[in-house]
Amino acid sequence: MCGGSFMSESQSELDKYGTNLTKTAATNKLDPVIGRDAEIRRVCQILSRRTKNNPVLIGSAGVGKTAIVEGLAQRIVAGDVPESLRNKEIVSLDLSALLAGASYRGEFEKRVKNLLEEIQKSKVIIFIDEVHTLMSAGAAEGAIAAGNMLKPLLARGELRLIGATTLDEYREHLEKDPALERRFQQVFVGEPNLEDCIAIMRGLKERYEAHHKVSISDTALVTAVELSSRYITGRQLPDKAIDLLDEAASSLRMEIDSSPVELDQLRREVDRLRLEELALKSENDPTSEQRLRSITNQLSGKQEMLNTLQASWNSERARLNQIGALKEQIDIAKQSADIAQREGRLEDASRLLYATIPQLQKNLAEKLEEQDSAPLVSDQVMPEDIASVVEGWTGIPVKKLMQKDAKQLLHLEEDLSKSVIAQKVAIGVIADAVRRSRAGLSDPNRPSGTFLFLGPTGVGKTQLVKALASLLYDGEIVRIDMSEYSEKFSISRLIGAPPGYIGHESAGQLTESVRRRPYSVVLFDEAEKAHPEVFDILLQVLDEGRLTDSHGRTVDFRNTIIVLTSNIGSRYLSDISLEATTAHEYVNDEVRRTFRPEFLNRLDEIVIFEPLSQSDICQIVDLNIESLNKRIKDRRIVVTVSEDLRRWLSKSGYDVIYGARPLRRLIQREIEDRLAKLIIEGLIHDGQTASFDLSGGAVNAQVCS
């Protein structure tokens, strides 16, 4: 009587504070576990020991530690375990449920003590996820932590416990208590390679198809693994690949459940025409009557198209729902067949395997054949869907090149030349690097391009970087002004202050910017003004495309273009007595004296910008006037400049040493200041034109309607 009563109470206590994984596995509610044979075998070996039979799974978050325990539960159900583990049960203990409501001193300890006694009697294997929480669970003032209560049982082998934790948590909590640590046997769980991860994804495919009621192509599985491995940093396989697949399937299911874009647009058009028809019916003039007849005819045609499209969509959606229901039925039938085989109900298993499932598969094949040649919505997850999710997560455009994107890349030099004048060599180098990256030919372990731009001030070095960011990177530019890093101690601002220093909690300016925007242009402006040791930090970035910040996080630079600008040797380029080849040699010599060889050797290209000529300045005048017109576009005011004034501006604003910046100041003083006075005095109004001309050596403004 006592034994029967105790087991009943024990079962209720275990149910209260835990989840029976073997029972869940017996009903096929756990996802299939593919691979991890070595880790599961090692766990079985440790559990079969006489003492210290407590494995602890240690690995990064997302590598599949919990899945290994679920795989062991499935093997116990299937009988594929050593004799010592046959008919055992694995119970996942919920420490939060054990702690909840234990408000009085000693209540938590009593719960733990009763639970441990019941576990010893029932001979179950306990699994605790985040096992490091044992160290602090219940450790209030005057109380005993759960970890200390477990130590004697763990040492004697009277309690079998499987733990799971991360490397950092293990080091921080368990290693600090050697008495508890030595009672566990470590099982390291590493990240699976790409081939193993693809096998895992294929094993999960049917479950996700049944849940989302869509089909998943094999290429989508492979794409999910490859893209997550390359573009999603800070997380581990297979977790991040599974998340990609899950979200892509969820997005597709949402599209199926809502109206297609074509149908939605047509419905809105019909609603607009109906409103216009109602408004015109109250008018009696001939024009309105004629317009009403036209609207009525349009509405009739659009309504007929809408009805046809709606009927087609209803039919297609019904077919998709039937396909989803059939897949779900097949999945349930397969699970039922597995359960029947394990329980020895061979007649039921035979009926399911050789009658029910083949019939369902036949019905599914028939429904799939009914698919329209041009469906409104696809029910299959394709690589493009996976790429869309990656783009949404990271901002990196990993979709296959669209026609317009390819056209833009082919004409990138022309587009950049509209913003940067007379620097064809530099523009060509940058454009080639971008095309290599977008075509997938660049080294996947290095940044898309690393350049050092040299030349006099005001020739367009920074402007070229801004133009590239505006065209291809949606304006995403990470700008680091190196003049702010002239002191040695300021280096820590790039990656964050080290532990123990003020500002350690704050992120580094460089690492945090790239971590948040991994697809961007990184500009190190005025590089020669920084402390020499700053460039030691950049060596790893230029060579391996990664950098570790002060918090130990690895930041990925592989999708960035890195540009450093400098004025080193600009005096040689501005010296008109030197030939271009000689000037370039002098500049390169000075660069080699300023920067270390290991730094220069990691750059893709050192680009020298040429000084601007008088004709180049004329084109820059046009660019500045165009920029001014864009700024006042909202007022509908237009600024025009006569040819005489244009030539005068280019001549007066030209300086071979200072480049185009004196011209900008001249235009600001002679044109923008005069225009500002006209606007404030009310002499020019919206929609008018301000014409600027040169008369008697002075600039005059005239307002035209």
Curated annotation (Swiss-Prot):
Residues 405-611 are annotated as: NBD2. InterPro entries: AAA+_ATPase, ATPase_AAA_core, Clp_ATPase_C, ClpA/B, ClpA/B_CS1, ClpA/B_CS2, ClpA/ClpB_AAA_lid, ClpA_ClpB. Gene3D superfamilies: 1.10.8.60, P-loop containing nucleotide triphosphate hydrolases. One of its GO terms (cellular component) is cytoplasm. ATP 1 binds at residues 59-66. Residues 14-191 are annotated as: NBD1. Keywords: ATP-binding, Chaperone, Coiled coil, Cytoplasm, Nucleotide-binding, Repeat, Stress response. It is found in: Cytoplasm. The keyword Cytoplasm applies. Residues 242-373 form a coiled coil. Belongs to the ClpA/ClpB family. This is Chaperone protein ClpB. It comes from Tropheryma whipplei (strain Twist) (Whipple's bacillus).
